[in-house]
Amino acid sequence: MGLSWALLPFLLLAFRAELLALQPALGSQPPSASSSHSMGSSRDFVSNVSSSQHPQPPGSEASAGIPDSNRFPQGLNSSHVPGLFRTNVSAEEQYLSPDVTSSETPPSRVSLDGLDSQDPDKDSGLPFLVKTPASQISVQTPDTKVPTKASGSKLSLEHHNLEPGSKISSEIYQAASFPQQVGGPLAVLVGTTIRLPLTPVPSSSPPAPLVVWRRGSKVLAAGGLGSQAPLISLDPMHQARLRFDQIRGGLELTSARLDDAGVYTVEVIRGGVSQQIREFVVGVFEPLPQLSVQPRAPETEEGAAELRLSCVGWNPGSGKLSWSRDGRALGTSDPEGAEPPRIRTERDQLLISRPVRSDHARYTCQVRSPFGHTEAAADVSVFYGPDAPVIRVSSDRDASPALYVTAGSNVTLHCSAPSRPPADIAWSLADPTEAAVPAGPRLLLPAVGPGHGGAYACIAANPRTGHRRRSVFNLTVADLPPGAPQCSVEGGPVDRSLRFRCSWPGGVPAASLQFQGLPEGVRAGPVPSTLLVTVPARPELSGVAVTCLARHLVATRTCTIIPEAPQEVLLQPIVEETQPGDVVVALEVTGCPPPSRASWARQGRPLAPGGGGRLQLSQDGRKLLINNFSLDWDLGNYSVLCSSALGAGGNQITLTGPSISSWRLQRAQEAAVLTWDVERGTLLTGFHIQAWTDSSEVDRVTMSRDWVSLLILGPQERSAIVPLPPRNPGTWAFRILPILGSLPGTPSQSRVYQAGSDLSPGAIAGIVLGSLLGLALLAGLLILCICCLRRYPGRASVKKQHSLTLAPVLTPPAKKIQSLTPVQTPRPLPIKTKMQSPHPAKAQQVISPSPTLCPGGSPWTVRAATQV
């Protein structure tokens, strides 16, 4: 029997009993149109049930429709359906009045809201239309024709007799509203029982409720509540596993299977009107599986086509599958039509296209269900590299070792090459003969030298993939050239050009040389080590500074040369005593700057440079050396000529033996001062100050009156101070003996030093003669003046008006104590230089008297003081 045939008798009986039970209440209680009907569904629920015509009074027609058993309600809402029922719920009973304000109500019919319980006769003849949103049941009164038609079963119900003129009050006893789904989806395991309770349990008071259970659009069970209520229908396909509770209205489905999952709906119907609809979302899951990722140790290379990981043990019924990498969830595949991502999922597999090194991670597949979760993981190894090796250099001395390292520093080379697994590092040195090359990322080069410079190759090899990469680093070891750059300039052929030369040889790498200051248009470098530039000779080049700029990795040095014409050329003799008795004489020319060349001559005969023998010229030609000098052979005239493209000049000198050209003896307090001169060209190595005396108090002088050397002075000395005994010094004789090596020269003339206050007879005679001569001259002058005055008396008076006035001459007082001693010399001797003595003495004043006539005619001795 179909569902329509099963529901038809129960529906008719329930509707008839409801009408009979509500008839007395309609006359005593007015219906209310303000109550709401509790219903909801996620699907549309529409079915029409038509019943066959029954004999009814005229104008009385009732039609009812029941839901289609093959359609599942989804989005049912009372606000969307015209002609909805509104209920007024009180503590005792509920009243239902139809709302016929919808446009679907024919205008010839009167809605249930227009019924008046106080005038039953008037209302009994009006049509009564009732439509529910769920069942679309139409009831017309007072006609009792109730056509009932269930769609799908094509069944026409038999007519039922209703009393004509009876007042019908559609009273529906419904329970309190309940939500569509309580507690979220229902999850069960395969093989367990699905229990769907109906909460709250509908009241079993008449009219008896009808409970219909569906899964989707398929009816699973339908029946009334109560122990005496019949069970109308059970789905034949699930009849063996279905249990319908007719007391509480619940449903049980034993031995749950995966296909039992879905949306279950329960509908409570009273008197042909759907009152309650509730949905249950049921999920059926298999127990959580034991998962594993295959392959267990996946390996691939960077740039491979793809890598697939499978989550073994998962099936769709056990739960939702997800993948993660290092704990971060991986996104799902892109929508259809978009470019597929590089990492995507396909069923139970994770596909990694074109793996890269960042894909090296731990991948986890996880299955999650309401009953828990399980997971499995695998470590994916992505081999790559080696990349191009990178060589870094460090030095304990240098700030920028990548450019160069200085000789003697300790250098370390570091090589790194990103690779998985780590690459094996090997070195290839610049020196191919080096056999013991250590393996590893660090290469130590202690105390590097120029031989360590060159190319160093780092070779990185991946031991897993076999790939190899190589990089080369050029190590520069810088060694500064010794000394400093040397600059020179010399004349070209026929003195028409100047050749500038700069040299700084040695060093690693070679220094770069360049001239600065040369005329424009002259190519002046840079060149390594040695630079030679020829410039046409021009007068304006004289005095111009030309600088050579020498650049090296370690330092930058300069040298400057100024080409000049010869000026004030002068020869100077230089005497050196290399060994006792062995003398070397040199002639050095000054005022002969580069680019001048010096040409030497002796006694008018030119000297060839580099001729050998005892006469030798220096490398620059500006010094003439005379080895093993001999007074018999090497004395004479020497000359030099300096010439260049800028001018010429010369000088000559006559070399003589050791001698004194002139000397002086002066008195001082308790000392004798000697000064002397020598001719230019005199060769000597020192002076001996010699003396003898007739006083026996001097221990250094013998009674035989031999000359004794009191002082020995150097060749540059030109004065000497000889201290004398303070008491009774006596008479002294002094002379100067020049020395050349071990050979004595010609001594000077001797001079006598007379100590004490008594004048010698000669001095007294001189003073007397001088005084007489002075008086005679003064008398003659007076006589001459008298004669002139007598001869020219007028002019004398005029002259008297202009008397002669002489300014007084002031002599500054002496700073030291002076002594007066008469000597035979008429004037003092000037002192030029100081004399050094083995016994140091302080500088003293030398005072020599000078005879002068006093106003009275007698001579005075005037002191002449000289500070020594």
UniProtKB/Swiss-Prot annotation:
Q: Which residues lie on this side of the membrane: Cytoplasmic?
A: 785-868
Which residues are connected by disulfide bridges in this protein? Answer: 311-365, 415-458
Query: Membrane spanning segments where?
Result: 764-784
Q: Which residues are glycosylated?
A: 48, 77, 88, 410, 474, 628, 637
Q: Which residues lie on this side of the membrane: Extracellular?
A: 28-763
Looking up InterPro entries in the UniProt record yields: CEA_cell_adhesion, Ig-like_dom, Ig-like_dom_sf, Ig-like_fold, Ig_sub, Ig_sub2
- State where composition is biased (Polar residues): 71-80, 99-108, 133-143
Report domain Ig-like C2-type positions.
289-381, 389-474
Q: Where is the composition biased (Low complexity)?
A: 26-52
Sorted UniProt keywords: Disulfide bond, Glycoprotein, Immunoglobulin domain, Membrane, Repeat, Signal, Transmembrane, Transmembrane helix
Annotated region (Disordered) at 26-82, 96-154, 323-342
SMART domains, per database record = IG, IGc2
Cell location: Membrane
May I ask which residue range the UniProt record assigns to the signal sequence?
A: 1-27
This protein's membrane topology, according to the annotation, is: Single-pass type I membrane protein
Query: Any one cellular component term from GO for this entry?
Result: nucleoplasm
One Pfam family name from the record? Answer: Ig_2
What is this protein identified as?
A: V-set and immunoglobulin domain-containing protein 10-like
